[in-house]
Design a protein with these regions (language model features):
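Canonical helix-turn-helix DNA-binding module
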Residues: 49-92
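Basic, amphipathic "hinge/linker" alpha-helix immediately C-terminal to the N-terminal HTH DNA-binding motif
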Residues: 86-107
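Short glycine/proline-centered loop/turn elements that form peptide/ligand docking sites
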Residues: 30-34, 66-69, 73, 123-124
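Terminal interaction helix/tail motif
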Residues: 109-146
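Alpha-solenoid HEAT/Armadillo repeat architecture
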Residues: 46, 61, 101, 105, ...
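N-terminal leader segment of winged-helix/HTH proteins
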Residues: 1-32
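N-terminal helix-turn-helix DNA-binding core of bacterial DNA-binding proteins
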Residues: 21-63
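N-terminal positioning helix adjacent to the helix-turn-helix/winged-helix DNA-binding module
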Residues: 5, 33-37, 52, 99, ...
Length: 146
């Protein structure tokens, strides 16, 4: 790789950040991390998994204390509810409330369904390659920082 290509890769990352900023505005007090958490919880439930904070943390590759804080905020705002396991009182499961389901429907399902036809010029292979490259680049930059 050349220095110029590294610069172009960083420029592409900036464009990706700008594309994220073009997502629809969220309601007051709702962060993008709420939307990600709702999405992960629903995906895990679809796979037959009763989601826990540790599942969110592992899936999103985020530290548990931050995820715990976000879950508490979401519960306080009425998007999630927690339920202690009947079998093991140390385990707490996460469930979307009606408000959480509506929020996820609007900002996950509906928005991305509307966006889908505009992206048909990007092949699944190109998208997968971009994702893989950005993940590798992020890992390299993170390791270099440590």
């Amino acid at each position: 790789m050349t220095i110029e290509l590294i610069k172009q890769l960083l420029d592409a990352c900036y464009l990706a950040k700008r594309a994220r900023e073009m997502l629809p505005a969220l309601p007051e007090g709702v962060t993008s991390s709420y939307i990600q958490c709702l999405d992960v919880i629903q995906k895990l439930q679809t796979r037959g998994i009763q989601p826990k904070i540790s599942d969110l943390s592992d899936t999103l590759n985020l530290p548990r204390p931050g995820v715990t804080r976000t879950v508490k905020e979401m519960e306080h705002k009425g998007y999630l509810r927690k339920q202690v396991s009947a079998e093991d009182g140390r385990v707490t499961y996460l469930f979307l409330t009606e408000s959480g389901q509506a929020l996820s429907q609007k900002y996950n399902t509906d928005y991305f369904s509307q966006l889908l036809p505009y992206l048909d010029s990007i092949s699944e292979e190109d998208a997968a390659c971009t994702i893989q490259t950005l993940k590798k680049f992020h890992a390299i930059m993170r390791e270099r920082k440590d």
